[in-house]
Design a protein with these regions (language model features):
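Selective transmembrane helix interface/packing segments
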Residues: 5-258
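Positively charged, low-complexity/disordered segments
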Residues: 1-2
């Protein structure tokens, strides 16, 4: 028993294992070949289910709103205010996109806080994919509105002609970086938080399974660990909100060329 306990204590798994995409089930389908359901696909489906369930439960015809209805209305008001302040009241047609994006990211982040769960947004395919989609969509929007004049975005107003060959490439690189910055910010923040919880959780488990005195003294760091978990829930909301704020800001830049 002591040998097994020592092996468990020193058998340290990588905190990055939780981000690995693994196949849960697979089958062979004619003309399609090998089709697999991964943990990424499963938790994406679960995320969409939670988003739909939240809105179905919040749909209420009664005069007195339920708690679900109040939470749904407050969430809608928050996202609506975000879009109105960033994009402008005249461009609220982008509200459905930003609203859907916010709730998908929010529930994807929150699902990752469930023990033994998988965080969809820690997958580069999802985070970087959403970032690139937003970038391409915003670029197409700007080109469709301003046509050739859109390229004036890369030359700041009042720039001397002699500096244009130097500033234009810098502005272009800065603009292209948007394709990655959204996804990298989301991916890095979520992966860092979950890695920290994995490391601290494993360390606390080792302390709790040692002597009685040490397990009693571990209660204090365990309380701090609970506070970090609560903070990670807040980070889940903040990262979804920041992603949507920057998306709305990029839409405004494409419309107004600021």
């Amino acid at each position: 028993g002591d040998v097994y306990k020592r092996q468990m204590l020193y058998n340290i798994h990588s905190p990055l294992e939780q981000f690995e995409v693994v196949s849960l089930a697979y089958t062979e389908i004619p003309y399609f070949g090998h089709v697999a359901l991964t943990n990424l696909g499963l938790y994406t489906i679960i995320t969409v289910f939670f988003v739909l369930a939240f809105h179905i439960l919040g749909f209420n015809h009664k005069i007195v709103p339920s708690r679900w209805s109040l939470s749904l209305e407050s969430s809608f008001a928050s996202v609506h205010g975000l879009v109105k302040s960033q994009v402008g009241a005249a461009n609220e047609r982008f509200l459905p996109f930003v609203y859907s994006l916010f709730f998908f990211l929010l529930f994807a982040n929150l699902n990752g806080n469930i023990p033994y769960g998988f965080t969809v947004t820690t997958s580069a395919i999802v985070s970087m994919g959403l970032s690139v989609i937003v970038f391409i969509g915003v670029t197409i929007l700007g080109l469709s509105i301003h046509k050739v004049h859109f390229f004036s975005f890369f030359v700041p107003a009042g720039t001397p002609l002699a500096l244009v060959p130097f500033l234009a490439p810098i502005e272009l690189i800065s603009y292209l970086a948007r394709a990655l910055s959204l996804g990298v910010r989301l991916l890095a923040n979520m992966a860092a938080g979950h890695s920290l919880m994995k490391i601290l959780g494993g360390f606390l488990f080792s302390l709790f399974t040692s002597s009685f005195l040490i397990s009693i003294l571990t209660i204090v760091p365990f309380v701090i660990f609970i506070a970090i978990i609560v903070l990670e829930f807040a980070v889940s909301f903040i990262q979804a909100y920041v992603f949507c704020i920057l998306t709305s800001s990029y839409i405004k830049d494409a419309i107004d060329l600021h």
